Structure formats: structure tokens, C-alpha cells
């Protein structure tokens, strides 16, 4: 057979296999037995091995690369992948639609919506040039994502070439990668049998599987995808309807959710919401709400975008899922400040698709208020679909032998006394750093990014250092040596040297970071900055009184008493002195006198978006230096919102609440005046 004949045979096999793939993975209608498919696939492989000059990147054999990537490279999206604004109630949905209608050229028209399930997976962007899949990326920050091309190719229902003879010059196809419920359960069952790691939920499994450096691992996972939209498109006339564009994607060879529906007006949207809510547990995939999009593309273009969210679409989230189960025991966990937190151990129950066997009880006031007892049948909710909590007790199911939950007299970790102050809901272990649980959490906080920032000192290594008796106090970290570190499991000489370098680098810090790192109760990042600005050094704080501290912005009576108590404890001062002797230092500064006439003094300010002249932390530092309180969320108590480019949902909320919005130019004038 000559070269032309060989090339034609290869193309025939490729077309045949693509057809089989499409019917099997997209239409769920197998055309041939598996054995016949395998024979065709093997024949194609043999041809390509024998005649590599005819191997092309869109061949079905190229779905998996055997060579692991060194790292994920950044990929810029041609058209940004925007997030959706969320609504949780009917009133919020009505307000969203009302705002959209008011911005249209013809506000009295009846709106038609494309309604889709909101899959709980990982959003991806696939780029096709001349009909060939050239690269794929995660959403990332909306503008730039991670290159996952090799991994996307392992998903059999993703076409490597569009099923049309006249494809667009370039098109971006957006979709959600997920793992079906049944496949997730089967995968976890196999993993348990093999003693391998299992996943907590399908969403985590999908995200973890897709972001593997080795695409062969991705290929071993049961990944699937539904496509939901088009980004950039060049040299191709798209329909003026989102629903018609979804039909076009089907023609191109993509899977589109069969649950997509057309709805008219708000009533149609609410009907779809109730329909999907009722059907949620019967669906083969996880969803956490529904998405409404105005169907007309021309109307979408009229409405445009607010920062990172479109005005023409929103996600209507489902309420937290609740289930019933039995509370069989209560354990106690110890935090950084000694807080003893009760944790419910439950008979395992599936809540919103996740098996829950533990739930927070918050504190003893909550236990008393809800009258929770061991043996009770309780209602469990995944708060925010993430953190399981005990909501209430079903009293009529309470057994005769139900037992009261008692506060332990001694710490479950170190055996020290557990004390609960009369006016506090939280009980605490008094063991301090003698308690291994507190020491571990304290070390983790001390090393964190906003504290001393000791890169490479993570929770696993901290556990080793404390459990092996290598570290007994914070200062012991700075006396670690290469031999000790290198001898630890999974450490090695290179990692040990890197950690020692990070420890040395962390010695040069600032007074506010050092104070924050000490973990004084009720003193967060902002409070530490206020203290550092007014006291400059440890000696000044040692002499501070509660009354004096309370005159400072953002320091209340509780925080003030904790500061005075902390610096009155001899063992705390010993640790501080030892840390300073080991080389921790910061630039000396003069006591700052804040001009109380500046416009930010005493005001609550929220930063959102990107400032072109400075980073978020620098802007925050300037505001704090002017006596402002910088908050992470917008509320009715917010005085100003400083809005940079690509400002997000905080800007929307500020507008809705009537909060004053300051653009970057005005912000710079105020802080520099």
C-alpha cells in the first residue's frame, strides 16, 4: 500500500472511532460491541506507530499523554470566564430580574430565559482553532487559567475535532467537568478495597482528578463534562439565542445537559427551580442550584456586565441540605487558644451527596440551648453546603437512655484542667504550650503567611516536630539544625536546607507581624497593627494598662484585658526574650500620631477590585495608618468602598446599600493629603 492509501486508511479509522465515541459517550447509544471498538482502536495505533508521519494531535489515540507535565502553564482566555451572582430567595430573584428589565431599551418586554442545572464541578474553557482542540484551561481568575489540555483530552466525550465541515476559525467552549454520582461511589469503593485514598465528594474528586500533573491519572478517573456556553468566536455567525447556541454545541459534538429548559418570566424561572429542586436527588450528577440566562444574545449585550458578573444571568442556589441521623458520641478538639470544641460523632448519613459522620456542636451554650444529648436523633445540615452542623433534636425519638453531654474536667490531649468562665460559652484547656494540641496550632499560626511567614513549615511537619519532642516552644524552631530536620520522614537534606533558609529569612519582620504571630487572644491582624503603631516595641506594651489600650481604635475592653494578661505572664515574656535573642528583629519606628481630621479616621472601609498603583496589602496598611478599620465584607455599617478595576460582588452590594464608593484616583488623593 502506498502512502496515500495508508493515509486514507488512517483517516477512515479515525472517523469511524470518532463516530463510535460520539454515540457511546454523548448519545449513550453504542453502535458496536466493545470488542469491535477495541479492534479498530488497536489497528489505528499500529498504523500510527508504523507511520508516525501521519500521526495528528486530533487522533483518538492522543487523548492521553504518557509524559507527566512539569507544571501547569498559564493560559489567557480570549473572552473572560465570569462568575455568576447568586440569589437565594424569590425576592432576590425578583430584584435581579427587575434590575435587568430597567436597563433594557424596551423595559416592558416579557423576558425569555434559558434555564440550566448548576453543576457542582470544575469550570473549564476549551479552545478550538480550525475545528481542532488546541488547548484547554481551568477558569483560574477569570482572565487566566491553568493549562489542562492533556487532562481534558482524557475525557472521552470531549471532541478532539468538531463534528462539522465548516468550523469557526476559533471558538471557546465552556463546560463543567464532573464525576457522576454512581461512578464516584464505584471509584471510592474500589479505592477502599485497594487501601487507596478516597474522595469526600464528587466535586473534589473531579477537581483533583483534572488537575493532575500526570494525565494518565486523570484518564483513570471517571470524568464527564456538560457544556454550557460559548466564549470567543471568530469567523462564524452564531445564533442570537443561548438555547440555539447550546443546540449548535450538540451539533459540534459536545454533551449539553438534558435538563436545560426554556422559561418565560419570573414564574417560569421559579417553576424550573422547584422542578429541579424536587428532582435533585434523582439526578445522576450533583447540583447546588440552577442558572437563569436571558436567552436573547442581543439583550445580553445590551445589559453587559458588572465587574466579574453578567447582568443577564444569575445562579439561584438551593438551600442547605438536611438529613436525620443518630448522635452516638461526642469528642472534644483543642484549638490554638485552648478552646475545647465539642464534635458530634454520628451514624454516617448522606447529606447533599456527602457522607457525614461528624458535625460541629459549636459550644456548650449551643448544646444547652438545643438540649442535645448522646443517643438523640438529630437533624444535620451542611451549612453553606460545606460544614455539617447539628441543627436540632427530634425529641419524640429521644431514647430512655439518652445521656447529657458533660464538659470534660481535663484536657483530652494533655490532661490539664479545663475551665469555663461564667460569662463565656467556650471552655478552655489551661495547659498552654504544654498542651501539644495548642502548641501545634500555635506553631501553625506563628508560621502562617500573615505572621512570620515560614515557608515550608506545614501541619504535617509541625506534627512530627511536636510528637517527636523536637520542638517544645516557639523559639525551638530557630534552633533546629540540618541533621535533625534531614533525618525526619519525607524530609531529606534539600527540604531541610530550604526550611532553615525560610526560618532565617523570617527573622527580619515587622513589629505588627510579630505581635500577630504571638497569637494573643482577640488580637487579629488589624489589632496587631494598631498596637504596633502606638507602642513600637515590647517594653511599651508590657507597661500598657487596660484603660490606655481601650483608647485605641479597634481595641475593646476584652481585647485590652487579654493584651495586659498576656504581657503579665512570665512564660510569655521568656518566649519573647528568647525569640529576640535568636535574631528576630524589625525596623525601629517612632510612635505614630494619627491626624484625626483625615476622612478615613474612625471609618469602616472595604477594598474591592485591583488598584493599579499599589497592592491590596499596601492599601490596607495606608488605611490602618490613618485610623480606619478595614473590613472584608460590605454591610450597612460600611462607610466607604474603595473600588479598583474588576471590582466584584462587594461593589454590587455597596451600590444596593447606598454605601459611598471611592474610585482609585479619589482614594489616592485622600490617603496622600
Swiss-Prot record:
PROSITE patterns: BRCT, DNA_LIGASE_N1, DNA_LIGASE_N2
Keywords, comma-separated and alphabetical: DNA damage, DNA repair, DNA replication, Ligase, Magnesium, Manganese, Metal-binding, NAD, Zinc
Cofactor: Mg(2+); Mn(2+)
Binding residue positions for NAD(+): 34-38, 83-84, 116, 139, 176, 293, 317
Keyword Nucleus: no
Residue ranges occupied by any BRCT domain in the UniProt entry: 595-673
Chain residues that bind Zn(2+): 411, 414, 429, 435
Catalytic activity, EC: 6.5.1.2
InterPro entries assigned: BRCT_dom (IPR001357), BRCT_dom_sf (IPR036420), DisA/LigA_HHH (IPR041663), DNA_ligase (IPR001679), DNA_ligase_AS (IPR018239), DNA_ligase_CS (IPR033136), DNAligase_adenylation (IPR013839), DNAligase_N (IPR013840)
Reactions that this protein is recorded to catalyse: NAD(+) + (deoxyribonucleotide)n-3'-hydroxyl + 5'-phospho-(deoxyribonucleotide)m = (deoxyribonucleotide)n+m + AMP + beta-nicotinamide D-nucleotide
GO molecular function: DNA binding; DNA ligase (NAD+) activity; metal ion binding
Function, in words: DNA ligase that catalyzes the formation of phosphodiester linkages between 5'-phosphoryl and 3'-hydroxyl groups in double-stranded DNA using NAD as a coenzyme and as the energy source for the reaction. It is essential for DNA replication and repair of damaged DNA.
Protein name: DNA ligase
Organism: Legionella pneumophila (strain Lens)
